[in-house]
Amino acid sequence: MAKDIKFREDARARLEQGVNKLADTLKVTLGPKGRNVVLDKKFGSPQITNDGVTIARDIDLEDNYENMGAQLVKEVATQTNDVAGDGTTTATILAQAMVNEGIKNVTAGANPMIIRKGIQKAVDRAVEELQKNAVSVEDKESISQVASISANDEEVGKLIAEAMEKVGKDGVITVEESKSFKTDLNVVEGMQFDRGYVSPYMVTDNEKMEAHLEEPYILITDKKIGNIQEILPVLEKIVEQGKEVLLIAEDIEGEALATLVVNKLRGTFTCVGVKAPGFGDRRKAMLEDIAVLTGGQVISEDVGLELKNADISMLGRARQVTITKDDTTIVDGYGNEEDIQKRITQLRTQIEETTSDFDREKLEERLAKLAGGVAVVEVGAATETEMKEKKLRIEDALNSTRAAVEEGIVAGGGTALIDVLPSLEEVQADGDESTGVSIVRRALEEPVRQLAHNSGAEGSIVAEQVKQKGTNIGFNALENDYTNMLDAGVVDPKKVTRSALENAGSIAAMFLTTEAVVADLPDEDDNDDGDMGGGAPGMGGMGGMPGM
């Protein structure tokens, strides 16, 4: 395919147009008074959202050169979202400001390679200062503030803070669509896996169709149980103690299942069987997790154990187990705390080492089940469009909260970025390097300017006012006044602000050092339709058909 090449100012100008088109679309969503953007969908109703990364992913421009510029900034938004889970609009605004300021200087004759060094020095210094100004997040109120700011909704903030309090910072918090209008929090304590009882005759609560076991013994195996004789010796010992039993196996079938059901119905003893969760190697790992949590052993030929030789000492215990037709929940396993912590450490190491997003997600689920449980935020709304928009906001808020717990918080509303400006005066730079520092200095004001603009205030005046006031004193866009942002609860996770700045600086430096752009020429086939049209008159002979 033939290519078209543009050089120097012409190349950078076309890329800049793409950057501005994408950034200008995202900018309107910033802050508590930011607006929504409507996205056309090929199927179904249009999507209404103010989520930066969702909007960015949906934008493709017709002009190849402009589209390349847009895609590069889209990378900033996506990268920031992947690392910090939020801050995509801020990252895009910073990138646009650095690109626009930088291109002015490069066009005026500055050396882009030296400017790049200045940008990097300034970004590194700003990140150091952000670290100094960060405040750690410990209490429920701080978590609620972070989530409220991100979701632009106080109720959501309270829900997420409550969820994190109940399942811990390592616990899994998932966001699902509710079947009602109300947004609720449902917390599942203990370990839950998606396997229910193998027979409805095993339930102990006929009204709810659930089985509740109190302080049961738990037999864990990766084998099928088809012959009752294999587990009879250990079952007899459990019956002698008058205890209930939970069997977790690959499957329970045939004679074994029939015998267990008959004994349950006769009231001889209570036994519930469930299939082992997961598949393949993941199943073995999950069974091992259950064994560690309950203080038992996985009875498997892999470790030289057989069901017929199983002893009561190999079984796990738990305070309570609830089994429905779909799920099994083990609460307060009797496992050794030291062993559980070792297992948690092992899972954290695996999460850090894995390169697969799918594996990481599954490992995080396993970690949460061991570390504290699962909280489900069920999102309710009147329409599907509203539900999707709300769900995106809650997911952003959740990511922000996790980022805040990890690295602490800084003053929100772009205040933290302006607070680092004095530290840039200390950066050792001269010539075009100092131009790079100046580019970053100007860009750091841009989020405050845009926030003010979206609130109906004059951006440049607000930015100057914030610069003159003390650390953490910023413009509260919701109230249209100046206040201590930390005291007012207007905060941002440091990780989000840091990632936005680092990614913006990186892409701006790449932009400014671009000297040529290569794009595909439009396909020649697009013009072939005219030839086909020219052939059509030749078919006019068919017009003579009546004369035949």
Swiss-Prot record:
Disordered, as annotated region: 522-548
Compartment(s) where it occurs, according to its Swiss-Prot or TrEMBL record: Cytoplasm
Keyword Chaperone: yes
A Pfam family hit: Cpn60_TCP1
Compositionally biased residues, Gly residues: 532-548
GO molecular function annotations of the record: ATP binding; ATP-dependent protein folding chaperone; isomerase activity; unfolded protein binding
UniProt GO cellular component terms: cytoplasm
Catalyzed reactions per annotation: ATP + H2O + a folded polypeptide = ADP + phosphate + an unfolded polypeptide
Highest taxon in the source lineage: Bacteria
Chain intervals with Acidic residues compositional bias: 522-531
Family matches, as InterPro entries: Chaperonin_Cpn60_CS, Cpn60/GroEL, Cpn60/GroEL/TCP-1, GroEL-like_apical_dom_sf, GROEL-like_equatorial_sf, TCP-1-like_intermed_sf
EC numbers: 5.6.1.7
Job description of the protein: Together with its co-chaperonin GroES, plays an essential role in assisting protein folding. The GroEL-GroES system forms a nano-cage that allows encapsulation of the non-native substrate proteins and provides a physical environment optimized to promote and accelerate protein folding.
Annotated protein name in UniProt: Chaperonin GroEL
Species, as recorded: Natranaerobius thermophilus (strain ATCC BAA-1301 / DSM 18059 / JW/NM-WN-LF)
Gene this protein is translated from: groEL
